[in-house]
Amino acid sequence: MLTLDTLNTMLAVSEEGMVEEMILALLASPQLVIFFEKFPRLKNAVTADLPRWREALRSRLKDARVPPELTEEVMCYQQSQLLSTPQFIVQLPQILALLHRLHSPYTAQAKQLTESNSTFTPALHTLFLQRWRLSLVVQATTLNQQLLEEEREQLLSDVQERMTLSGQLEPTLAENDNAAGRLWDMSAGQLKRGDYQLIVKYGEFLAAQPELMQLAEQLGRSREAKSVPKKDAPMETFRTLVREPATVPEQVDGIQQGDDILRLLPPELATLGITELEYEFYRRLVEKQLLTYRLHGEAWREKVTERPVVHQDVDEQPRGPFIVCVDTSGSMGGFNEQCAKAFCLALMRVALADNRRCFIMLFSTDVVRYELSGPEGIEQAIRFLSQRFRGGTDIASCFRAIIERMQGREWFDADAVVISDFIAQRLPDDVVSKVGELQRLHQHRFHAVAMSAHGKPGIMRIFDHIWRFDTGMRSRLLRRWRR
């Protein structure tokens, strides 16, 4: 069967003008005009999609099939062009019968030309073929326009769905034009309104927690630049958290003398029940000479230093992908779960804006993976946000998964982010050693986002940076009061 592209070539019908006219009509539709006014960042993203639309329309016209009736009429027309005038006169009754049988628009005009002229001259022969060709051109143009109109309706429907999705997610995920473009590309998937409303919900939660968004911005761009202090610059106060040995209940390290009743050795506690030794017990208690368990660990204190305010010689640093590990244990449920998911959404926003990859891993008893910056990023984000945090804590598996992924060439400059309350067992020595090797030899940076003030320092000491967001009731009330 004849294709429409072949028919256009045979009749010298140009579809380019019709395609451009259809694109302009689509862009001028009221739906797109209103959308562009409301979301100007997405206008460039939609405009960048125009070449793909043109190519899709050309492909549709190229592959379309011509109806059998029109194909038969075109074949008859081509054969008639090869006939001389005497031969054409002989074939004329069959040609008229074929036009009548095919219900050709040229039938009435063909009969009029033959019946109104008693003699069929060569000039009439030429006129007959010219008008027949003109009729075929009109039919081909009409067929092109019908197909383009069908495609326009389908394209407008698809664009409206993507506009609705992109418009809903633009406040949450599109920070700049680059992010808006990537968001528009992601919107090409098959999503329903109820699906992406989950992202809108967590976006609203993130907007209600500006400190969490600010923390994600600081972490996401903490590698952006390196500054060299300028000489004789004014100084400013700079506060950092430093580790130091402290007596915190992390591990038993031996025996010491003291007055801590809760950590008394059983023999010392037994003397309290002997009448003759009771006063001796109190004397040693006052003098802090009772034998107690010695528990050592690490604590954090705030160190105040000064640094220059003015900087120069900014050296841009490479910004690689994010590998984000999220603790899905039972202790991370409730408000912690909301904060962890919203924080990942904020990192996705940073990744889209800076053209970076954002890879999420959930660690509990198993490791589940999502890539939020790929072509199916929106679907992946919805699946991630739909997860429930009800498992156990296996932070060692999380680190092993990070280490394995960082072996790939495409992750050579990745930053690892671990979101947890860090209430877990100590890390195995081999994991600690491998993390240190990645930090030392490959300049990988490991960030901890601590959702609790009670995380074990023994676990957190391996991180380059610790970002604290206490989700306790007291801290939540203080943050709300400060706003």
Swiss-Prot record:
Query: Which InterPro entries does its entry note?
Result: Uncharacterised_CoxE (IPR008912), Uncharacterised_ViaA (IPR023481), VWF_A (IPR002035), vWFA_dom_sf (IPR036465)
Highest taxon of source? Bacteria
Q: Name one Pfam family in it.
A: VWA_CoxE
| Gene Ontology cellular component list | cytosol
Biological role stated in the UniProt entry:
Component of the RavA-ViaA chaperone complex, which may act on the membrane to optimize the function of some of the respiratory chains. ViaA stimulates the ATPase activity of RavA.
Family under the similarity heading:
Belongs to the ViaA family.
The protein's name:
Regulatory protein ViaA
This protein's gene is called: viaA
